[in-house]
Amino acid sequence: MSSFAFRLQKVFEYRELEEGWAKDNFLTKHIARMEAENELFDLDDNRKFLLSAGADDLQARRELELRIQKLDDNERALRLLIHQLEMEEEQARDEWILKKQDKGVLEKLRDKAYDAWMYRQNKLEQAALDEWSIQQRKTA
């Protein structure tokens, strides 16, 4: 019995690699977005702490106001960054799904080719068994 060889095996292996790269890219984008969201939560915690601490005199109030203003600016920048990262993550997810589908098509082709090969092998084996049984009857 000969071994199964898929004609498009190299293409299939490359599609597997592409799918893996797309998945890694998506996960990288997802992690970057999650880290930015964590920074936003930390920034919010910092703001709450500053507001709860309060200020005793006029100079301390001015410093507090400047710190809060800086936190607001950082928050706006982070929100813009998060929005951009969300769009990149969605684009990377769509690309990953597309690469996964491309690989799936070749996987189905490989499975069908394997089934056809097995069918041919079984027919050859059955023909050999039939021939053997005919030879056995002739000698008996």
Spans of features found by a protein language model:
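Charge-rich amphipathic alpha-helical interaction elements
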Residues: M1-A140
